[in-house]
């Protein structure tokens, strides 16, 4: 919030069009990173609710959530690398878009299998609800990562 407030003050000052666009990109990045933090908090809250309800995940669910966490971790690592780079290459930016596709596809795959697994009593309905809440939040986190990458890409286009 303090960073966003400062950037809003900067935009109100005397800046060139390019300067204002750069600050707007920074504001987008700050907002989206805050949303990433909110996703992490929501994941923790979901796990707490699951724990409070005495619901257990079977090994398959745990493995699938771990795989989604790995995809998110890779997306976050690439985002941090892009943020750290003065001039990220388009090939590095494309890695993020590809990772986002992987996250979306994996979410879709798990969502489809979830209904079938509940119907086949592979696990309880309530386990499936918490499971899909976790997977959806992980996918949302990936969306926020790609929004940061979009803002980085916009900055690069304006500088080119």
Where are these regions (language model features)?
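Cytosolic, long alpha-helical scaffolding segments
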Residues: 1-160
């Amino acid at each position: 919030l303090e960073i966003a407030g400062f950037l809003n003050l900067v935009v109100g000052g005397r800046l060139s069009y390019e300067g204002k666009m750069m600050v707007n990109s920074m504001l987008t990045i700050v907002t989206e990173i805050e949303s990433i933090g909110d996703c992490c908090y929501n994941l923790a809250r979901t796990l707490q609710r699951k724990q409070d309800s005495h619901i257990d995940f079977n090994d398959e669910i745990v493995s699938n959530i771990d795989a989604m966490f790995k995809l998110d971790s890779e997306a976050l690592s690439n985002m941090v690398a892009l943020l750290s780079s003065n001039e990220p290459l388009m090939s590095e930016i494309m890695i993020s878009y590809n990772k986002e596709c992987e996250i979306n596809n994996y979410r879709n795959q798990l969502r489809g299998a979830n209904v079938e697994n509940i119907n086949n009593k592979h696990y309880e309905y309530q386990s499936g609800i918490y499971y899909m809440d976790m997977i959806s939040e992980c996918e949302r986190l990936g969306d926020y990562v790609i929004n940061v990458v979009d803002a980085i890409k916009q900055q690069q286009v304006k500088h080119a």
